[in-house]
């Protein structure tokens, strides 16, 4: 690539950072960093009706949390918000008007709706019908004067050559082309309130900021021919376009929807639940791209080095919540304890469980956690009531050898002084119980685990027993023996 790589992520401050938008930002970031280019943040805030207070700060904060940095943004550069660039848009709108490539349109929303209703009834795709078609200059002047007298504010439309072919070689999908007659006719580049439309402003911005590549979701494919109309009208070279496939829900097979309740879809949600940012970064990077091979855990540096835009998938990317939870567990298991402890601290404090056992409990459950907030549920045994046993657990306790195992193990535990109730002293008692009862393996460990903790699965049993404390464990064993 000879041209300087410059890519952008251009969110609208209309809400929280969604997984799909985070992927767009991440792929642009990896592409820029891999090629030694620039990653730019631009805020597209011309949709004033949907503008959310603090939306911009939220977007940037969540991108930072994920581990991304950028070279240019509204924080460091002037006029990187579309609302600050209105004079620039007006300059090019005036140019197109002066060159006869755009014009004022006075059709009202009601008239446009009526046109579309007729087209729909006739089975014709909706498109704008030029209101000046067939008018003489005098008729056109009279029409405009009449509309002005009615205080109808015009929009500005750009002229579309319906016979032209708008095509590009897409980085992901290969060659794509649209006929000019299939993009809806002359379209609005400036709204009645004076603000530019998205498809016009984005072209001016990308040209002005010397964007070399536009990498975005394939829901933007239909926007691309409209943007090429503007590039052609202004005599500018278009950037290279790449349209990533959509993200689907792995359980439904349908496009990921904000209404899907089986997935968390906003980065803020993952932060609140105590997921590790590196895990989310890793997971999102593999949604629609893969370096090949079986490896799935990658550092940011590895992803930058391996990223290859030619390996972007042409098939939809499946968002699998269980896979993400598995990946976060891998990161938590292998993270420094101090980092994991800090991650769990707010949840322990909120649950009133940040006591002298907190560090040992986090250490105990670190290998099991899929997110830091799970520490509260995992430690319920130490602070709440004894859990309700499953049918399978009850069957295990009903085994013929269980009473002998539990009573023998209980007797040996009871002999340990409180001061010696440690993992080092508890561990040998299992071997001693096996030797005395002749019971071994699952039939030895499982009844003790169920009786002591109420669960068939969990962290290391000697550590669990030591942290529960002598009094509580003996009480649990007595309860199991007396059933």
Swiss-Prot record:
Ranges spanned by the short sequence motif 'HIGH' region, renumbered to the chain: 11-21
GO terms for cellular component: cytosol
Family annotation (PROSITE patterns): AA_TRNA_LIGASE_I
Family: Belongs to the class-I aminoacyl-tRNA synthetase family. Glutamate--tRNA ligase type 1 subfamily.
Entry-linked InterPro entries: aa-tRNA-synth_I_cd-bd, aa-tRNA-synth_I_codon-bd_sub2, aa-tRNA-synth_I_CS, aa_tRNA-synth_I_cd-bd_sf, Glu-tRNA-ligase_bac/mito, Glu/Gln-tRNA-synth, Glu/Gln-tRNA-synth_Ib_cat-dom, GluQ/Sye
Subunit structure: Monomer.
Enzyme kind, highest EC tier: ligase
Encoding gene per record: gltX
Motif ('KMSKS' region): 255-259
Reaction catalysis annotation: tRNA(Glu) + L-glutamate + ATP = L-glutamyl-tRNA(Glu) + AMP + diphosphate
Protein's name according to its UniProt entry: Glutamate--tRNA ligase
